[in-house]
């Protein structure tokens, strides 16, 4: 019975280690920066027959890597969204925005600071959205001003045609 228990524990530990390796390989293939060395620690525990510790470490390791991948995906989305917003701001509204800010996001990303990318990217995106909204509002006000000026010009011309001699050159 003790042998059966040990075999079951061994099998669960081996499965946990195998799953953690697969997840680690996926993270590595995506070039996600991961400085966690828990996998080698798990392998060491396994070689020492510490199967319970391997199982527990595997659960924690998998949870950390899953969270890391989630952060990485969110950081990718933020960078993409910010880049597209910058392109739109430049092409549709003529807004010139500092590319150094995008470079800063890329630097944080390459260093594996995905939380920093998310935090800074969301702030930059909000600021750029506000700038675009202000530009749209300014364009609308300019258009309204041009329309009122044209109406006034037409009124002045109409008065001039009717022989009104008052000065309408305001």
Describe these PLM feature segments.
Residues 1-170:
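Long, charged/polar, soluble alpha-helical segments
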């Amino acid at each position: 019975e003790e042998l059966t228990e040990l075999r079951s524990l061994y099998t669960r530990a081996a499965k946990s280690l195998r799953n953690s390796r697969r997840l680690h390989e996926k993270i590595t293939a995506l070039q996600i920066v991961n400085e966690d060395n828990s996998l080698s620690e798990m392998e060491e525990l396994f070689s020492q027959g510490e199967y319970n510790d391997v199982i527990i470490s595997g659960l924690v390791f998998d949870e950390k890597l899953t969270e890391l991948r989630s952060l990485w995906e969110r950081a990718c989305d933020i960078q993409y969204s910010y880049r597209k917003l910058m392109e739109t701001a430049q092409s549709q509204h003529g807004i010139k925005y500092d590319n150094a800010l995008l470079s800063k996001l890329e630097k944080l990303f390459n260093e594996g600071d995905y939380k920093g990318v998310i935090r800074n990217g969301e702030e930059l995106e909000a600021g750029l959205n506000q700038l675009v909204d202000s530009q749209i509002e300014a364009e609308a006000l300019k258009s309204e001003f041009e329309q009122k000026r044209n109406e006034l010009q037409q009124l002045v011309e109409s008065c001039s045609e009717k022989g009104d001699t008052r000065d309408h050159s305001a």
